[in-house]
Curated annotation (Swiss-Prot):
Database matches in Pfam families: Cytidylate_kin
Protein name listed in UniProt: Cytidylate kinase
GO terms, biological process: nucleobase-containing small molecule interconversion; pyrimidine nucleotide metabolic process
HAMAP family associated with the record: Cytidyl_kinase_type1
Organism domain of life: Bacteria
CDD domains: CMPK
Record organism: Burkholderia multivorans (strain ATCC 17616 / 249)
Keyword Nucleotide-binding: yes
The UniProt record lists the keyword Transcription: no
InterPro entries assigned: Cytidylate_kin, Cytidylate_kinase_dom, P-loop_NTPase
Amino acid sequence: MKSTRPFHPTPVITIDGPTASGKGTVAALVAAHLGFHLLDSGALYRLAALASMRYDIAAEDVDALVKLIDDLHITFREGCAQLDGVDVSNDIRAEAVGNRASAIAVHGPVRTALVARQRAFRKTPGLVADGRDMGTVIFPDAMLKVFLTASAEARAARRHKQLMQKGFSANIDDLLRDLRERDARDSNRAAAPLKPAADAKLLDTSALSVDEAVDQVLQWYRALGQPA
């Protein structure tokens, strides 16, 4: 059956999935392999939050927030989030920044502005976008949509390892409980619930290495007749 998906000259690969599924790592490596631009949609909200704090813009000042988001200079390179050319990957993980991101995201105009910024990352030669609704909401016409997941136990183990490597203490049972609670919230929310697009490729990475997951995404891309 011939696809009815609208044609766009700039290819997009979307990689959606739950927390700690490895989608960010896979997306960054796929983008690097293909020479594509990279979008970490989750970090985008935190970058906007960090910028609002640095410029003393109140979380309730919707007009100022929208203008700020429109003017932000944001790039993602090799897993690093840059604001005005400076790596702020660690800064945006602060609890205060996360709280501010939640506070500004409640405003409809702010979410609309952030959606526009996400779509603006679509530039030649192509884009790899990772998040939760990239294939369903932001880029419904993406050439390749991947929904990457893993068991809650595997994801908790990965997150625990990441935190320990960064010098943080963590209890794996607490992480597992938090992941399951977040999965339930994300899957049942009214706006853009976490779910695979109808035409997404499902990739369970519970028993896969990062390289194996990347290779599978690239195989799917090649199968579309694209050089990879």
